[in-house]
């Protein structure tokens, strides 16, 4: 049903009408159809920083110094200026109002990187309930590092990786966690996942999932490490068993002692093989059982042994979605071409409860129907619970099914869709301007996913969803007059405030030229 676009009429309607139960926030978000970032300040004079993102509650704007040594945090404010003449809306903004400082107030600058380290500009996780921020610094990669101490052959090494937990209110460093001669994929926060107060960090080099708890005091506390061992007392049990064997040898009972680094499969790998074997063993037909054991288990046994953990996400406080694949795929920039597997792991029972290949139809249909369960968010975060997905938005579902119908090979389509799993933590913007029930836009040019995209000299249009031919606003990255050199490849990122009609577009080239920052807001 058509609703008026007049803000005053909508305010009166909100006063006299009671929305249906459970729809009050959706009704309130419709006001964003009227309040849009329709005005642009081009090529804003701003600090030479690498801008990261707004926090999910909109209280902070995170950036890093260009030398990747310092964290610089701003408080978003709103433009204020005085006008002596009548009808101020028809005049250009005064020069002072067109600066970065008119929209952002610097709170502090903190040096995070020590000697030899650099801040990973793509890594930032925010704990909204305590207003804590998690950042990462690291030294350079060593690509041909020898696999010592049980490390995986072919995985690079980083001499020092440090995770810093900060209180964003004042920039105080509350705690740090250091990994030496290890490898954690820090790009786009792939190697870490935050769920409420639980933090999972994946060590690719040593194949461990470190589960930590972030206390209200700001302490990082070890909960468990999943990989070589699954239960807290596994290592104690194996060491005590080895001691018994040593005593037997001393008493004349000659047994071959196990080699600590090569005798046993890791705990998580043993759980995986056990799940696959039991699934086949439960086959009622004995002939079918024997054939499946030969074809699906013993024939691929070494392939399963060679799998390594690529990526992890929480499904809830007790279950992890773990992605397995080859060593090459784990460190490759384009892991989509490599076969992979997904396992659901229960941390309390230490059991694998589900296992799928990345081409499994069953997993895809689960993802299509229950996409929101993969994009888990903190219970305390109101803003993250209303992002559009194909399981909660009919327009997103239609777009997905259109893409699926165009696919010539359904198996390849499934693999392409499953490449996004496990989902990266806090990788989507909760801005209402990405709500597909309110606006329609070209997702090839802009979307809620936090990624750089190829820039265009044409404005990106946001069309009203209820009135399909009405342009609500448009955003143009780069200089107002367009690029003078059409051959130079340019990339662009968009940083939307989660609540206010405020966004930044940052256009940069691959030749270390100065970035072009535009501010889009409602005037």
Swiss-Prot record:
An annotated Gene Ontology molecular function: ubiquitin protein ligase binding
One Pfam family hit: Det1
Cellular localisation: Nucleus
Keyword annotations from UniProtKB, A to Z: Nucleus, Phytochrome signaling pathway
Lineage top rank: taxon: Eukaryota
GO CC field: cullin-RING ubiquitin ligase complex; nucleus
InterPro entries per UniProt: 6-hairpin_glycosidase_sf (IPR008928), De-etiolated_protein_1_Det1 (IPR019138)
UniProt motif (Nuclear localization signal) ranges: 401-416, 472-490
Example of a GO biological process term: protein ubiquitination
Subunit structure: Probable component of the CDD complex, which probably also contains DDB1.
Record-stated family: Belongs to the DET1 family.
Role played: Component of light signal transduction machinery. Involved in fruit pigmentation and fruit nutritional quality. Acts as a negative regulator of fruit pigmentation. Probably acts by participating in the CDD complex, a complex probably required to regulate the activity of ubiquitin conjugating enzymes. Repression of photomorphogenesis is probably mediated by ubiquitination and subsequent degradation of photomorphogenesis-promoting factors such as HY5.
Name of protein: Light-mediated development protein DET1
Lineage of the organism: Eukaryota, Viridiplantae, Streptophyta, Embryophyta, Tracheophyta
Gene symbol of the encoding locus: DET1
